[in-house]
Design a protein with these regions (language model features):
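Domain-level signal for soluble alpha/beta catalytic cores
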Residues: 1-142
């Protein structure tokens, strides 16, 4: 028996919580970068920059993944850190959240955060990720 109201009228958080409580699958998008490659992102070029340089391509990928059934859409921000982008990292993160929200208004938004700093500096790596996670969480909530 489904815990969902016909037509999906429960709020998104309730729908996702009910699925998780029932140990059901929640569909999370995948392949944002693959989608960008299909639209012309050259191998080796950071995909996060397209949030500012080619936002229409990021929107197209997110819309396609949402149309395919993704209930959770990840931001195109996995490498958007101050080490790589300096002051532009904040603008990229903000744009990645905005684009995901525009493209998939009925989906939950999850921030994608990759490694920061050197893999040899483990303490900084996790501290940097925690800082980035907190910043991205604020952007998603606001």
């Amino acid at each position: 028996m489904s815990a969902f109201v016909s037509g999906g009228t429960l709020p998104l958080a309730d729908r996702l919580s009910a699925k998780l409580a029932q140990h059901r699958v929640v569909l999370v998008d995948g392949g944002v970068v693959d989608g960008l490659h299909a639209l012309g992102l050259p191998l080796g070029e950071p995909p996060e920059a397209w949030c500012l340089d080619r936002p229409e391509a990021v929107l197209e990928v997110h819309r396609g993944l949402a149309a395919a059934g993704a209930e959770v859409v990840t931001t195109n921000s996995v490498g958007a850190n101050h080490g790589r982008y300096g002051d532009d990292a904040e603008a990229i993160c903000a744009a990645s959240v905005r684009l995901a929200r525009i493209a998939a208004p009925d989906a939950a938004i999850a921030g994608a955060i990759g490694p920061t700093g050197s893999p040899f500096e483990r303490r900084f790596l996790f501290t940097g990720q925690a800082t980035a996670a907190a910043d991205l969480q604020l952007r998603i909530e606001n």
